[in-house]
Design a protein with these regions (language model features):
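Hydrolase catalytic cores
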Residues: 47-51, 76-83, 99, 107, ...
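Flexible, small-residue-rich helix->loop connector segments that border functional cores
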Residues: 2-7, 33-40, 45-72, 99-104, ...
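Extracellular S/T/G-rich loop segment that most often corresponds to the catalytic His/Ser-adjacent loop
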Residues: 5-12, 16-21, 167-257
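Extracellular/luminal low-complexity segments enriched in Ser/Thr/Pro
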Residues: 371-384
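Surface-exposed or secretory-pathway low-complexity segments enriched in glycine-proline
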Residues: 328-329, 339-372, 409
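Substrate-binding/access-modulating region of protease and related hydrolase catalytic domains
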Residues: 20-21, 26-41, 53, 70-174, ...
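C-terminal subdomain of the subtilisin-like protease fold in secreted/lumenal serine endopeptidases
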Residues: 104-111, 151-152, 175, 189, ...
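C-terminal edge beta-strand
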Residues: 395-420
């Protein structure tokens, strides 16, 4: 898989602490008035969401953790927060880390940090006020460390101020800013939303949890067992757009990995567009209220929708997606894929393996009716299907006969419980 962060300063094999100018730390607790102002495990938690090893029967699965055969995403730990040192979180510290990442093979920078919403309210104000950081990110974007894309991918958390704008740097037009939704697929109570916000991902929301500890509705991931808060545990719960952001970074890593496997190469703008259009709809749910939130306030403000890894992989592959609503026999138009005369073509067959039918709970084989695909999915999921038609005439030519030629399109069917009129699904 592509490297999301690389190495080169002396003694940096396990990453580098750009605050202390030495080894990465994770257990520098600094207690002030009963509150830990030092290391919190935040970065470790984020890293686990991206890259925790899969299929090992332990803990959690990272979005890009691989199959368990040492094929997961590679991470470089560039620590910019450490203890309560004066340079912890400073713009100059992050700028140095970002440039280091570019110089040492990074393809994606996963940035679960940023300024409070409203600190900057325009791109030009951010460029002036945080010029050293802006220039470092520009340098990273212009780096070319992966054969699948011609620049660096920059992904930031939108912020946790419950404010109708993204915080910077995420709000900058060249970067991807990630908002957060909770397990009920509604906006998390804390998430920023509105201008500058590009896409949404799971970030947890303790307020909807029924358990006494109010943690199970948050995101479970890796934490440093040395921190007193976790009592020796290697896994813990956190919430925030910081937790949503690595879901998108992990999906981006999967997409680049798959592009390398398929021998594909995209411009940076093409790849970002693919990420931002690999989404499920959220608008359908934004009615009524939730824990004091007026959901209508979030309409068209959470970004393009909720990130969907499968859709990105299909975009990389070049396989179009057909969306179907669970529980309804429906006709899906094929005009977009077979041309304006799709309804008048002669269709020869629809092919879907029993395994793929089972994935969607299909008991009646899909067919063509009036030039549209008739399909009835009874459970949510994703699966492949192919449709074959004749281009030119009502029969296939060859031998002693004259006729058209077979054309076959493969599709990925995405079945979801809810349909939206704009073609989005969740």
């Amino acid at each position: 898989m592509p490297t999301t962060t690389g190495t080169a300063i002396s003694d940096d094999i396990y990453g580098y602490n750009f605050v202390t100018r030495g080894a990465v730390s994770w257990d520098r607790e600094v207690w002030v008035g009963g509150e830990n102002k030092g290391d919190s495990g935040h970065g470790t938690h984020v890293a686990g969401t991206v890259a925790a090893v899969n299929n090992n029967g332990v803990g959690v699965c990272g979005v890009a953790g691989g199959t368990g055969r040492n094929d997961g995403v590679k991470l470089m730990s560039c620590q910019i927060f450490s203890g309560n040192d004066a340079t912890s979180g400073a713009i100059t510290t992050s700028a140095e880390a970002i440039k280091y990442a570019a110089d040492n093979g990074a393809v994606i920078i996963q940035c679960s940090f940023g300024s409070k919403a409203g600190t900057y309210t325009s791109d030009s104000a951010y460029e002036r006020g945080s010029g050293v950081q802006y220039n470092a990110i520009k340098y990273f974007i212009e780096s070319q460390n992966c054969d699948a894309v011609d620049g660096g991918v920059v992904i930031f958390a939108a912020g946790n101020d419950a404010t109708a704008m993204s915080g910077y740097p995420g709000a900058y037009h060249d970067y991807i800013s990630v908002t957060s939704f909770s397990p009920d697929y509604l906006p998390a109570y804390y998430t920023n939303y509105g201008p500058g916000c590009n896409i949404s991902a799971p970030g947890g929301d303790y307020k909807i949890s029924a358990d006494a500890a109010k943690t199970y509705a948050e995101v479970l991931s890796t934490v440093p067992s040395e921190l007193s808060e976790y009592n020796g545990a290697d896994y813990g719960f956190m919430q925030g757009t910081s937790m949503a952001c690595p879901h998108v970074s992990g999906v981006a890593a999967l997409g680049l990995s798959y592009a390398l496997e398929k021998g594909k190469k995209f411009t940076l703008d093409e790849f970002k567009t693919m990420i931002l259009t690999s989404v499920n709809d959220m608008e359908t749910y934004l009615d009524g209220s939730k824990t004091g939130l007026v959901l209508a306030d979030y309409r068209k403000k959470m970004g393009t929708g909720s990130i969907d890894a499968y859709q990105l992989l299909m975009q990389v592959e070049g396989t179009p997606c057909l969306r179907a609503k669970v529980g309804t026999k429906q006709l899906v138009a094929l005009t977009k894929y077979f041309g304006g005369s799709a309804s008048n073509l002669t269709y020869l067959r629809v092919e879907m393996t029993r395994e793929n039918m089972d994935k969607l709970g299909i008991t009646e084989a899909p067919s063509i009716s009036y030039g549209k695909l008739m399909i009835h999915c009874t459970k949510p999921g994703v699966a492949k299907i192919s449709v074959t038609a004749i281009a030119g005439g009502g029969s296939v030519g060859g031998g002693s006969s004259m006729g058209g030629q077979e054309i076959t399109k493969e599709f990925a069917v995405i079945a979801r419980a809810t349909e939206n009129a704009n073609g989005g699904w969740l």
